[in-house]
């Protein structure tokens, strides 16, 4: 009916001109007292809606929310095409069209920045960096020896492309890292996350992945597409992680392992062995979550 919605809000904070959503039975009491004009909701819950709130019936409310959030968002971070006179640009770099570089950022040699890139203040880009179109790089980021594909977002304080924690075991001789980091398209890297360059080849983060804040990804790690990795996760060197893997906060993954597709690793888990496709693991050492739960129950009864 061509209704106008001013905001997308949570149920408890919504008002008469807002759109909200319901996806969790824990908030059923809030649903009954809702003030919003309309609610994204599954059909089985519409009986709890007050008469003034119109239902927008979907099968997956949270997915609908994710899509709508991008319609409602205020896109205030996008390039205006202005390079600050306080930025430092190497003559051996190449900058394409409509690139914004804010004050005190440094673009080093052998760096190429393609169209419509935004770079915040006090960031250090290069050397040996290629940034593709429509990338957003926030303040205080450092990127070296890296390729960032299109439509990625690198949040404040991230560190990409530094040398990894590699040395010979007996003598502690440092191993020189000559590889790089590759961030594939439409991936988000959280604040203060560190991704080390490979020893020889590439440390790779797959496309459409979401890496949270304060994550450590070591040299030669390969993470396939659609990964979701929560804060304070550490992944040791040369581990390979499959598609659509989810890793909970503060989990640790040992080096030189293979984690299959569609794996879920619960928060605070310690992964010491390979994990097959479609497994859900928890605990230390990480094991099938059903076994882990049985052990927790057994120990609690002692």
Regions flagged by a language model, labelled:
Residues 1-86, 151, 157-158, 162-174, ...:
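Terminal amphipathic alpha-helical/low-complexity segments used for targeting or macromolecular assembly
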Residues 21, 82-288:
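Structural signal for interior beta-strand "rungs" in well-ordered beta-sheet cores
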């Amino acid at each position: 009916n061509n209704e106008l919605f001013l905001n997308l809000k949570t149920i408890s904070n919504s008002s008469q001109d807002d759109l909200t959503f319901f996806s969790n039975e824990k908030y059923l009491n809030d649903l009954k007292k809702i003030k919003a004009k309309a609610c994204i909701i599954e059909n089985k819950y519409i009986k709890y809606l007050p008469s003034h709130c119109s239902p927008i019936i979907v099968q997956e409310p949270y997915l609908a929310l994710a899509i709508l959030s991008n319609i409602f968002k205020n896109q205030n971070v996008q390039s205006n095409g202005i390079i600050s006179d306080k930025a430092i640009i190497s003559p051996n770099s190449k900058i394409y069209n409509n690139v914004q570089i804010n004050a005190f950022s440094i673009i080093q040699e052998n760096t190429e920045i393609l169209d419509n890139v935004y770079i915040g203040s006090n960031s250090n880009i290069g050397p040996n960096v290629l940034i593709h179109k429509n990338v957003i790089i926030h303040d205080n980021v450092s990127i070296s020896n890296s390729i960032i594909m299109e439509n990625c977002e690198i949040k404040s304080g991230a560190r990409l492309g530094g040398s990894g924690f590699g040395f010979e075991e007996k003598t502690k001789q440092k191993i020189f890292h000559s590889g790089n980091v590759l961030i594939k398209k439409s991936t988000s890297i959280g604040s203060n996350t560190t991704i080390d360059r490979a020893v020889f080849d590439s440390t790779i983060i797959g496309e459409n992945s979401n890496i949270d804040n304060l994550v450590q990804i070591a040299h030669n790690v390969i993470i396939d597409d659609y990964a979701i990795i929560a804060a304070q996760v550490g992944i040791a060197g040369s581990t390979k992680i499959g598609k659509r893997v989810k890793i909970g906060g503060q989990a640790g993954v040992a080096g030189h392992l293979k984690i299959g597709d569609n794996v879920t690793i619960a928060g605070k888990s310690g992964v010491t062995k390979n994990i097959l496709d479609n497994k859900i693991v928890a605990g230390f050492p990480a094991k099938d979550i059903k076994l882990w739960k049985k052990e927790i129950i057994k120990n609690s009864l002692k």
